[in-house]
Amino acid sequence: MQTLFFTLIAFVAIILLMSIGFIIKKQSLKGSCGGLSTLGIAKACDCDKPCDTHHSKLDAGDEQAKAEYEQKFAKKDDDSQFYQVK
């Protein structure tokens, strides 16, 4: 029981010290070194239908948007229910 109490006090003290340091520096939180962009992922999209922005690109005749539409949203012959892992 003493070990549990000591561990709890240690965690609270560490969190308190980190919060004081954060307040003193007055810096905003920053992301890691690139996040998903370092993995080559532009953005995550699990939508069943394209959004308005994508529709406007398609209407404007953007070839890259058309290729992306075919890859993500066009119905395929196989009726698989799973996402493809890239």
Curated annotation (Swiss-Prot):
It is a single-pass membrane protein. GO terms for cellular component: membrane. InterPro entries: NqrM. Pfam families: NqrM. Its main location: membrane. It is found in: Membrane. This is Uncharacterized protein HI_0173.
